[in-house]
Amino acid sequence: MKKISVVIPMYCEEEVADICYKRVVSNLKKLSDRYSYELIFINDGSKDDTLDILKKIASNDDNVKIISFSRNFGHQAAVIAGIRNVTGDAVIIMDADLQDPPELFEGMIEKWENGYDVVYGKRKTRSGESLFKLLTARMFYNTLNKLSEIEIPKDTGDFRLVDRKVIDVIATLPEHNK
């Protein structure tokens, strides 16, 4: 049976940690006839009760692993720590705030099973964001795509599914190339 790993970085997410866990597991259990799963939560030096909540969750679910940083190292460091510790055939990376809906997992996995090595979750709208945020996001993606040999779809964020072979390559890159 293939395994799906879900990497979820958290920084001061005590308000949503349990809700996030329940929604993610609920959607993974719908696929349990075809896939096993693991959840890797990365506590990025939270100053609230995020770590205690994660420990309680992990004590009741053997599919949950926790990586905890001594201080806040940043979102990307947390993601990299997570992907370096996955054991799955595919990895879903998502934010804990549930702007990336776990209800899309099944469709992402279906695309992966059809041969895609990377499946992006793209936002339909950027509702609730300021004009400044919208403009800087547009500038970021335009600049990134001019500098990159590979086009990065706009408004994708970190919500994606990545095949194991891609994860293995990413994990070998030196820090400054990630």
Task: Annotate the PLM regions.
Residues 69, 94-96:
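Catalytic metal- and UDP-sugar-binding loop of GT-A-like glycosyltransferases, i.e.
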